[in-house]
UniProtKB/Swiss-Prot annotation:
HAMAP family: HTH_type_BetI (MF_00768). The keyword Transport does not apply. Residues 8-68 form the HTH tetR-type domain. Gene3D superfamilies: Tetracycline Repressor, domain 2 (1.10.357.10). GO terms for molecular function: DNA-binding transcription factor activity; transcription cis-regulatory region binding. It holds the Pfam family TetR_N. Pathway: Amine and polyamine biosynthesis; betaine biosynthesis via choline pathway [regulation]. Residues 31-50 bind DNA. This is HTH-type transcriptional regulator BetI. GO terms for biological process: glycine betaine biosynthetic process from choline; negative regulation of DNA-templated transcription. It comes from Escherichia coli O6:K15:H31 (strain 536 / UPEC). Keywords: DNA-binding, Repressor, Transcription, Transcription regulation.
């Protein structure tokens, strides 16, 4: 009989091991055996909890997107009466949270983005994450701008966030957070300026 609470512990171990494997060898070369070995479990445990490698990869992407959502929401909840500018900066901060810009997370996101073009479930998860970002940004810009301008500003800021993140991920160097925050802050203030 399995120990109570082991499922969540095992799932966490396997997701962490998957991120480590993707970080070291890439998603396509990360085998079930390597992941199980890193987690200190048998390969049968992966089948038990996730069916197969694709199920484990899907759970890993869900975990990363959940961490992104939490990073953004935690910052927004700290600013319930904050200005649109502060709340937009909070959304940016959540997207540049350490859970999203660590080497393992960046490599996993790149692998998932590439795989999402061929795997419907990963595509849906990617679309949910992308739409959530755009919706959050437009909603905050909408507090101070007409609808069309808010949509354009939200789309532009989403593109800037993704672009800064992608450049860092592909450079193999850590994200320059001060530069990223400076550029996004300038974009935000430029679009919210009433001059």
């Amino acid at each position: 009989m399995p120990k109570l609470g082991m499922q969540s512990i095992r799932r966490r171990q396997l997701i962490d091991a998957t991120l480590e494997a993707i970080n070291e060898v890439g998603m396509h070369d990360a085998t079930i055996a390597q992941i199980a070995r890193r987690a200190g479990v048998s390969t049968g445990i992966i089948s038990h909890y996730f069916r197969d490698k694709n199920g484990l990869l899907e759970a890993t992407m869900r975990d990363i997107t959940s961490q992104l959502r939490d990073a953004v929401l935690n910052r927004l909840h700290a600013l319930p009466q904050g200005s649109a500018e502060l709340r937009l900066q909070a959304i940016v901060g959540g997207n540049f949270d350490e859970t999203q810009v660590s080497s393992a997370a960046m490599k996993a996101w790149l692998a998932f983005w590439a795989s999402s073009m061929h795997q419907p479930m990963l595509y849906r998860l990617q679309q949910v994450s992308s739409r959530r970002l755009l919706s959050n940004l437009v909603s905050e810009f909408r507090r101070e701008l007409p609808r069309q301008q808010a949509q354009e500003a939200g789309y532009g800021l989403a593109a800037l966030i993704d672009g800064l993140w992608l450049r860092a991920a592909l450079s193999g160097k850590p994200l320059d957070k001060p530069l990223a925050h400076s550029l996004t802050r300038h974009f935000i203030t430029q679009h919210l300026s009433t001059d």
